[in-house]
Regions:
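A residue-level signal for beta-strand positions that form part of recognition/binding surfaces
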Residues: 120, 380, 397-401, 431, ...
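Structured loops at beta-to-helix junctions and adjacent beta-edge loops in soluble globular domains
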Residues: 126-128, 162-164, 373, 384-386, ...
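Cofactor-pocket helix-loop regions in the catalytic cores of large enzyme subunits
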Residues: 1-167, 171-174, 186-363, 402, ...
Length: 480
């Protein structure tokens, strides 16, 4: 477990982890804080923030050069570019990683031995890995580690991203990425045009922009209008001051949401949407399980499900979107996304969801991927060196490292949970956790309101002293 306080972020996954632990599974947690997951662990690596990549590279060094614990058969038969990886790891000893990570070399060695020994080892990670300067490289290094030990393509192995919401996987499957169409077909590919033009007609084939590029475009004026649906970037995106400047610089802003969020307050037009209890459709979760959801309550007067709003907007713009139901839309998805082709609403209801790929009506679904081969044929080892600048250096003006994360009673920006009195009662305001030694040095006391200032901005929060984090670090939940 790396980069995830699963007890607060994914409580159902945490329940499975605790059950596996009771059955004898070994648990390793990499987290700067001593969270409930860390307390449960056989090994807790209280890493120095920002240094996940150095740790993963050191683990592979131990497995490869000291323990000879790599899966040579898997490497030879299923992967490529292994020699480049091997050369890049030669100097990544535990002694090299120790001053970077703050970990003892023997703890790194013990972790490497336990993971490689298996016989089945699985890695779960979340935003503590991805939302860092080295996030992409660390994900690549984790994929290297999995392939190095052959821990993929069979039950109880693999590399599992714990998604931030219940349909992140489904959104990506349906093309909510800048470079792909539904089914992960490149937008500018011949296959993409062949597959989708027959349903949609001609369409633009250039790749879209990444979220950071969109925000930059709003500020520099190259993007003049935006349509934001189910998103609250005024609270969820980094550097709120720059986000607000970009949104205010637009000529026209549409926001489609279920509540009046800080982002919606800046909109020229608000399209009131229905909540998840008021619509039908599917969610696809982190294990690629497509699950049917049913309408529990009718939408409130003046609101509509997202799919209906989108159809109405398309038709108003002169397009054609004459769908009558989510079922009809799903049937179109089945035509153009082969991994969904064997599913229908009846099967999803009867079988309590199916994991894609499910290419035919008689296919049982696929509980785990890459059993015989990878999508590209062979798995590609990549070189992921640790950069000189990790983006989190402290100095005299900013002597603390800020950690962010969730609490169990709030969900993302709190748009929904702050409207539940029972949930909001537990965490009604922002708080800052600080080690007692640091609080004493600054002559701060529990329950005082303090101003936390970074290079990007500041926030007022109520102080809590906590011994579950390291001196020199502070923790702030990102719901506020």
């Amino acid at each position: 477990m790396i980069g995830s306080n699963t007890s607060a972020q994914h409580p159902l996954a945490y329940a499975r982890i605790t059950a596996a632990k009771k059955r004898g599974a070994k648990l390793i947690t990499v987290d700067p804080r001593r969270t409930p997951v860390a307390t449960l662990s056989d090994i807790h690596l209280a890493i120095r923030p920002g240094n996940n990549l150095a740790l993963v590279n050191a683990l592979m060094h131990v497995i490869l050069f000291e323990e000879k614990g790599q899966d040579d058969a898997f490497i030879n038969e299923r992967t490529e570019h292994f020699d480049a990886l091997r050369a890049s790891l030669e100097g990544c000893t535990p002694e090299w990683a120790a001053p970077l990570t703050g970990l003892q070399p023997e703890a790194i060695r013990e972790t490497a031995r336990l993971y490689a020994k298996g016989p089945n080892s699985i890695i779960l990670y979340c935003m503590g890995v991805t939302q860092q300067v080295t996030g992409t490289r660390t994900c690549g290094a984790l994929a290297n580690l999995v392939m190095l030990c052959g821990m993929i393509g069979r039950p109880s192995t693999g590399l599992i991203p714990l998604r931030g919401q219940n349909n992140v996987q489904g959104s990506c499957d349906m093309g909510a990425l800048p470079e792909t169409l539904p089914g992960y077909v490149k937008a500018d590919s011949e296959l993409g045009h062949q597959r989708f033009a027959r349903l949609w007609g001609p369409f633009a084939d250039e790749q879209g922009k990444k979220l950071t590029e969109i925000m930059d475009g709003m500020r520099d004026g190259s993007i003049r209008a935006a349509y934001i649906m189910g998103e609250n970037p005024m609270q969820s995106d980094p550097d709120a001051a720059k986000v607000e400047a970009g949104l205010r610089n637009l000529d026209f802003l549409i926001v489609q949401d279920i509540f009046m969020t800080p982002t919606a307050r800046l909109a020229d037009v608000i399209l009131p949407a229905a909540s998840y209890l008021e619509k039908q459709g599917t969610f696809t979760n982190t294990e690629r399980r497509v699950q049917l959801i049913n309408e529990v309550l009718p939408p409130l007067p003046g609101t509509r499900p997202d799919w209906r709003i989108l159809c109405d907007v398309i038709n108003a713009l002169g397009g054609r979107a004459d769908y009558d139901s989510p079922r009809e839309i799903f049937n179109e998805i089945r035509q153009v996304v082969p991994s969904y082709a064997g599913m229908d609403y009846t099967r999803l209801a009867e079988e309590q969801g199916l994991c894609w790929p499910c290419p035919t009506p008689d296919h049982p679904g696929t509980p785990y991927l890459h059993a015989a081969s990878f999508t590209r044929g062979r798995g590609l080892f990549t070189v992921n060196d640790v950069p000189d600048d990790l983006g989190c250096a402290t100095d005299e003006t900013y002597p603390f490292t800020l950690l962010t994360g969730r609490v169990s009673h709030h969900y993302h920006t709190g748009t929904m949970t702050r409207r539940s009195w029972a949930l909001d009662r537990e965490y009604p305001e922002a708080f800052l956790d600080m080690h007692p030694d640091d609080a004493a040095a600054l002559r701060l006391k529990d329950n005082w309101k303090v101003r936390v200032t970074s290079r990007q901005g500041s926030i007022v929060a109520r102080l809590r002293t906590a011994t579950d984090l390291q001196p020199g670090t502070v923790f702030l939940p990102f719901h506020f």
